[in-house]
Amino acid sequence: MARTKQTARKSTGGKAPRKQLASKAARKSAPVTGGVKKPHRYKPGTVALREIRRFQKSTELLIRKLPFQRLVREIAQDFKSDLRFQSSAIGALQEAVEAYLVSLFEDTNLCAIHAKRVTIQKKDIQLARRLRGERS
């Protein structure tokens, strides 16, 4: 048999369409309702871990200044009315309070991990304070 030269042919785009199953056809023929896209959601815990990393890197104060100032003034009212505070004094109080809370939460987290949990509970805070000698 003699060899013949083959000429290039235009392709028609792959495989021939197959018949769809009844369930697929029913799904495709159903009307699309508005095309509203669901908002993206991260897996549980992903955002929490991202926030932990972000706050551990940062050095700024985490409690808002004005609400903290109102709280300090409200507590000070119980001891003496008409007390005045320098802004630097309230700033120093806020630094001390935040440092205390961060270290308390670190100890609380260790107590929860010791109990084979990842969620901190009230009893973890109580145990951490008791071990520190703050509360009997």
From Swiss-Prot:
Residues 1-41 are annotated as: Disordered. One of its GO terms (molecular function) is structural constituent of chromatin. CDD domains: HFD_H3. The modification N6-methyllysine is found at K5, K10, K19, K24, K28, K37, K80. Keywords: Acetylation, Chromosome, DNA-binding, Methylation, Nucleosome core, Nucleus, Phosphoprotein. It comes from the Eukaryota. The keyword Cytoplasm does not apply. It holds the Pfam family Histone. Phosphorylated to form H3S10ph. H3S10ph promotes subsequent H3K14ac formation and is required for transcriptional activation through TBP recruitment to the promoters. SUPFAM superfamilies: Histone-fold (SSF47113). Its main location: nucleus. The modification N6-acetyllysine is found at K10, K15, K19, K24, K28, K37, K57, K65. The modification N6,N6-dimethyllysine is found at K5, K15, K28, K37, K80. The modification N6,N6,N6-trimethyllysine is found at K5, K28, K37, K80. It is found in: Nucleus; Chromosome. One of its GO terms (cellular component) is nucleus. The keyword Ligase does not apply. The modification Phosphoserine is found at S11. Core component of nucleosome. Nucleosomes wrap and compact DNA into chromatin, limiting DNA accessibility to the cellular machineries which require DNA as a template. Histones thereby play a central role in transcription regulation, DNA repair, DNA replication and chromosomal stability. DNA accessibility is regulated via a complex set of post-translational modifications of histones, also called histone code, and nucleosome remodeling. The nucleosome is a histone octamer containing two molecules each of H2A, H2B, H3 and H4 assembled in one H3-H4 heterotetramer and two H2A-H2B heterodimers. The octamer wraps approximately 147 bp of DNA. Belongs to the histone H3 family. This is Histone H3.3. It comes from Meyerozyma guilliermondii (strain ATCC 6260 / CBS 566 / DSM 6381 / JCM 1539 / NBRC 10279 / NRRL Y-324) (Yeast). The lineage of its organism: Eukaryota, Fungi, Dikarya, Ascomycota, Saccharomycotina.
